[in-house]
């Protein structure tokens, strides 16, 4: 039987503010599935943890891990995996963690006049791509990552999140 392309995804609700978004977990699972299928990543045997937190929680993470003492919308923490064969072929490998901040995400969605679920899909796809090695440190990397995000989101019925700003040249 072929392996599922979607990693096992555990969604952890770490802040009560997420309680008014009962569909958040389904949105996250759909976004990760769409991203994994599009990039044809071999992640079906992997695990991801997605923590739904608040601005205070993500500010602490951002400060501790990046030295930036302010909240942000999403953080990704790729797991460091050995490049050789694993010792236990039956044990799932950890792909990494994603943290998403409710208040920052809500504010951005409101400011950009986009549905909350669309913005959650975008941040989930963005975080997943970081876990599998994509980045946006250079203009070329950003252009590649944004184009991939836009393509994945289109399959989910989410409009291009970058349409209202100039593309990088």
UniProtKB/Swiss-Prot annotation:
Binds 1 zinc ion. InterPro entries: MetalPrtase_cat_dom_sf_prd (IPR023091), YbeY (IPR002036), YbeY_CS (IPR020549). Zn(2+) binds at residues 126, 130, 136. Its cofactor is Zn(2+). The keyword Zinc applies. Keywords: Cytoplasm, Endonuclease, Hydrolase, Metal-binding, Nuclease, Ribosome biogenesis, rRNA processing, Zinc. It is found in: Cytoplasm. It is an enzyme of class 3 (hydrolase). One of its GO terms (biological process) is rRNA processing. It comes from the Bacteria. Its EC number is 3.1.-.-. Its main location: cytoplasm. GO terms for cellular component: cytoplasm. PANTHER family: ENDORIBONUCLEASE YBEY, CHLOROPLASTIC. Single strand-specific metallo-endoribonuclease involved in late-stage 70S ribosome quality control and in maturation of the 3' terminus of the 16S rRNA. HAMAP family: Endoribonucl_YbeY. This is Endoribonuclease YbeY.
């Amino acid at each position: 039987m072929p392996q599922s392309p979607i990693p096992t995804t555990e969604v952890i609700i770490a802040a009560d503010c997420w309680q008014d978004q009962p569909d958040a977990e389904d949105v996250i699972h759909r976004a990760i599935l769409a991203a994994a299928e599009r990039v044809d990543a071999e992640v079906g045997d992997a695990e991801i943890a997605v923590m739904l937190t608040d601005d205070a929680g993500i500010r602490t993470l951002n400060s501790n891990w990046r030295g930036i003492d302010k909240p942000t919308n999403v953080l990704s923490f790729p797991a460091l995996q050995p490049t050789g064969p694993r010792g236990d072929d039956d044990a799932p490998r950890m792909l990494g963690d994603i943290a998403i901040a409710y208040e920052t995400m809500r504010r951005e969605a409101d400011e950009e006049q986009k549905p909350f679920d669309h913005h959650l899909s975008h941040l989930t796809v963005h975080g997943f791509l970081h876990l599998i090695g994509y980045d946006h440190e250079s203009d070329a990397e950003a252009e590649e990552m944004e184009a991939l995000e836009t393509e994945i989101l289109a399959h989910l019925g989410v409009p291009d999140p970058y349409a209202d700003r100039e593309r990088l040249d």
